[in-house]
């Protein structure tokens, strides 16, 4: 605050200095403006100049001059000069007016005398004019001194007024500063008081808490002391009881010995009477009783087992019959051929293309055989893999609808068809969840579940089989008073591994269980998946229900065909044998397994390696598989050079 006061005082002093300088300049300017302007002069006549050289006043440094007075006809009442701006002139206006008139008369007379030719009179006139000029000059100096004095008084008054205002302003600033300092001090005191009060409150709280803790500790110590006293008393009572028990034990030991002696004497007497020892008599009695008990127990167990078996079979038959009656499933057997209808027979030629270029490109890209026969307005698509067959069907349908069929267009539509089939798989999985009433499943599991829409097991659609199994398991779980969601979930996911058998080696049950465990399924569901083919012993009712639902869905009449499943497995193994080789890009089993087309990467497989690859694949197929006829292995190595014209 002291620094602020010093700065404010310095500013006030600077302002006062500036005001004083401005007033001084104003006074000097006023003094210059108030000096009378010199009257116009004319040169003296030769006669007057001669006289003036002798009688001129010694106070003037310049050459004496004679004022030109107005002519008689111009009026003698006007003064020669006026200075209305000076306050002294305003005060003596009348006197100066009279003097001017006299001077004018004298000047007029002087002029007339000069015109008359009297030199002496002219000299007198000049002398009077000079005296008058000296008087006017003295009067002007007195007026100037008076003006200077008044100006100095005004400056002094102004300085005093400014100093007083500065003192008042300084006092006000000091008072404001003191008030600000006082307010800050008061705020600091208030803050210190609040801090001190808070600190005192915290100290009081700590004291209260310490006191309460001390009271609690004292109470606990008192309880401990009471407990110790109670334990001591209890220990004394236990010691007394131990002594009493020891005495009783000694007494019982003595009595037991006496009873044993009496018992031995009695047994000896009985043995003498019966002719048998005690051990022999006991053995005979136990043998008789044991034989009777075993016979009765065997009869009871046989009766219970027969009754339980009859009731169990009856109840199981009723549960399974009820489940089958309540589930009405469609025929789920599927073939490996898809029929695509054409708008006209001329479209067959466009599908074949020039020299079969289009149909070869289609089969190479999709891995689906196109069978064109005499059937009007229809072509057949044949492939053991339902996913690949569906992708080929969508691709060919799009090409036929568009009308532009060439190898580049086939590749574009094939990529678009793959995306569409992937979306259909997701929708199929979601529809399966909605149909079975299951919610909150991991998206990857839903995707794998939807892929089973295009998988078959012995000719039966796997997704339809899973949905049917889920319904059967739910019905049987309801009959057994079990949780329905858990049984349905296990039955719906038990064949999940079939969606990955082409990618991962192993049993589909173990693969599905591992995938379900990885995506957070319940351990009971995982166990039911891995145990539905008895690869793991079932340990829960949910696993047994899953097995039952699987057998019911797959064992009903018309559900499966074993020959189709073995055929599909043989084709999958053929593709796997070729696909495991390094440098292989794609593998397609064509012509119902009689031809295998292997697409290789041209940068990794040259022409010589392609021949060796075809021979090795053919030899491995001969060693591992059993098949009718012959299988031709074709290795395709294609190099493309693409240029863009702009």
Swiss-Prot record:
Give the GO biological process terms: mRNA catabolic process
**Residues annotated as domain HD:** 462-555
**Main subcellular localisation:** membrane
Q: How is it placed in the membrane, per its record?
A: Single-pass membrane protein
Domain KH residue range list: 336-402
Enzyme class, top EC level, equals hydrolase
**A Pfam cross-reference name:** RNase_Y_N
Which family is annotated?
Belongs to the RNase Y family.
What the protein does comes down to: Endoribonuclease that initiates mRNA decay.
> What name does UniProt use for this protein?
Ribonuclease Y
Its gene?
Answer: rny
